[in-house]
From Swiss-Prot:
HTH cro/C1-type domain sequence ranges: 123-175
Cysteine disulfide links: none
Keywords: DNA-binding, Transcription, Transcription regulation
Protein name: Putative HTH-type transcriptional regulatory protein STK_12680
Record-level Gene Ontology MF annotations: DNA binding; DNA-binding transcription factor activity
Organism the protein comes from: Sulfurisphaera tokodaii (strain DSM 16993 / JCM 10545 / NBRC 100140 / 7) (Sulfolobus tokodaii)
Annotated DNA-binding residue span(s): 134-153
Source species, domain of life: Archaea
């Protein structure tokens, strides 16, 4: 099983910008590394052969709010194939390295089988350069004219058989990249505000102000909010000052890589000045419901 340090070494060898997230340490955490590669922010978790639906929930929330591409590095995945792990991209370390080196990965494995991503713009460009009609291409592939129209309208996933025929006609430039344009459906965002916890109060306030809000469970950030281009990350004070400072510093690593603002939420008002001396932007629990986040 590949380790966090080994993945960090892979990134270092390529002189890529990254941060290792070291909070929490006594239980599973959802983010091991945040890396920036060719303007793509990758939120990385090394799982090996382990499975954790709770960790995956955190990763999906990060993607839903638009902070980066959620990646799980695992041992079981085949090389040069990306697995659909419920709107998270699962891959082995060799495939991860290929992506870092600028290679496109076009094979995507779901429960329905293995599919190939097609670059719609390149497909249309090649077809028009060759002077072929939609009908002629459809006949060559044994599909409907509407199918070819759909392939050209937006990037699509097709069967391996169809992909091979497309490559025979137009060359491998028409193959797409699974990471390109990756996004998670926002309709699954759940505020989870059944209780009146501190985090729930913050989320309610943000939601009323028009923010998209998600709750995190296994990292240094407790809440992530997004509105237009504005992104806010909230880290709630832990059990003691020492643990809180470590948590806040790890949260700062996350915000620095995804260009967001960090807000520290203080439970004990007597500690507010301590955190402010460390240059953290703080709000107290009593200020939450009336705080203007805009």
């Amino acid at each position: 099983m590949v380790t966090i340090d080994e993945v960090a070494e892979i990134l270092s060898k390529r002189s890529l910008e990254y941060s290792m997230i070291n909070y929490p340490d006594k239980k599973e955490k959802s983010i091991d590394i945040i890396a920036v590669n060719r303007n793509k922010k990758m939120i990385v978790k090394i799982l090996g052969n382990k499975k954790s639906s709770k960790i995956k929930s955190d990763l999906k929330n990060i993607a839903r709010i638009g902070l980066g591409i959620p990646v799980i590095i695992e041992d079981s995945t085949e090389q040069e194939i990306i697995n659909d792990r419920g709107n998270i991209l699962g891959m082995n370390v060799e495939t991860f390295e290929r992506i870092l080196d600028g290679e496109k990965v076009f094979l995507y494995k779901t429960r329905g089988g293995i599919f190939v991503k097609i670059n719609s713009k390149e497909l249309k460009k090649k077809r028009e350069e060759m002077g072929l009609s939609l009908g002629e291409v459809a006949q060559a592939l044994g599909v409907s004219r509407i199918s070819i129209y759909d392939y050209e309208r937006e990037d699509s996933y097709v069967s391996i058989d169809i992909a091979e025929k497309l490559v025979e006609l137009f060359g491998d430039d028409i193959l797409g990249d699974v990471l390109s344009g990756f996004k998670v459906d926002e309709k699954d965002i759940n505020l989870e505000t059944q209780t009146a916890s501190l985090s729930d109060k913050i989320m309610l306030n943000l939601n009323e102000k028009g923010y998209k809000v998600v709750k995190m469970n296994f990292t240094a950030v407790d809440i992530i909010a997004s509105k237009n281009d504005k992104k806010l990350l909230f880290s709630v004070e832990a059990d003691n000052v020492s643990k809180s400072l470590r948590k806040f510093n790890e949260a700062k690593k996350i915000t620095s890589k995804i260009k967001a603002s960090l807000i520290v939420v203080v439970k004990e008002s007597k500690n507010k000045k301590i955190y402010e001396k460390e240059d953290f932007n703080t709000i107290s629990e009593n200020e939450i419901m009336n705080y203007e986040f805009d």
